[in-house]
Amino acid sequence: MVEPAFYRELAELLPGRVRAGEPMKKHTTWRIGGPSDVFVEPEGREELRRVVCYASRRDAPLYVIGNGSNLLVADGGVRGIVVKIGKGLSRISIKGNKIIAEAGARLAGVAAAAGEAGLGGFEFLAGIPGTIGGAVAMNAGANGFSLGNLVEEVLLLDFHGEFCRKTKEEMKFGYRSSIIQKAPLILVEALFSCYPRNKEEIREEMERFLARRKLTQPLCYPSAGSVFKNPPGDTAGRLIEMAGLKGMRVGDAQISTLHANFIVNLGSATARDVLALIEKAREAVLARFGVELKLEVKIIGNCQAEVAECRSL
């Protein structure tokens, strides 16, 4: 565990915002994860900066999460400080054809605000869980659309507590990637460029995206969305299904019978259960197709023991 002083000092720095031993399963869409040593929900960017500066000064491990929709947390929890960017940093504002959204704004909320303003571009976000911070960081996308294409500029915070702005080009967006994944940077706010569109057309397209998602994805069970990135020219779901793993179950984790790139929690799944299925899917696809699947979900906490156990199954 981190030093007990970390909790006391942060609690004094941000009264009412800090908790010890917070169960991380409450903060991930998989509903999986052990306790974090220290858990902080900042109210605004200045409080976020204070936490980051404190962690840097004390050399404490720091993890930043949003809605936890693309995240697997170890059963043993997280040693360090977990910062959740949520309601305290969720403002959305519209200026002409531009939308400014803070990192904690829900994707569904941004899409709805754009639709109400008659601004197109965010329709593909309909039904996707998550927040702007995580979605921009990983350049989230669906149905051939990617969020990075709409970004004009972002406000970032580095792990030394310094704010900086970067353009779309400087963010170096790629398939499910950006510079945020390769450097100690936190997205604080993003400016998006949209285009005028008929409100009814926006509504109808969002309904089509949502209907398609309901037909093809296991929305009735907790999951983290796509587990693996799609390899060039193919999809991870197809490869896993062709390898015969659709429906495979370990404990209460199951490779979805509806979409093989989803692993669902049927009730009380653990990170160990999920990791076992991840290992089996990787091994089966590599053996049959010679394709090495790469994770799209992020794993935090010490999962080495779980991985070792999974490989022995």
Curated annotation (Swiss-Prot):
Location relative to the cell: Cytoplasm
Catalytic activity: UDP-N-acetyl-alpha-D-muramate + NADP(+) = UDP-N-acetyl-3-O-(1-carboxyvinyl)-alpha-D-glucosamine + NADPH + H(+)
Cofactor(s) named in the record: FAD
Domain of life where this protein originates: Bacteria
Residue stretches making up the FAD-binding PCMH-type domain: 31-197
Signal peptide range in chain numbering: none
Pathway: Cell wall biogenesis; peptidoglycan biosynthesis
EC number: 1.3.1.98
Keyword Oxidoreductase assigned: yes
PANTHER family attached to this UniProt entry: UDP-N-ACETYLENOLPYRUVOYLGLUCOSAMINE REDUCTASE
Name this polypeptide is given: UDP-N-acetylenolpyruvoylglucosamine reductase
Organism: Pelotomaculum thermopropionicum (strain DSM 13744 / JCM 10971 / SI)
Gene, per the UniProt record: murB
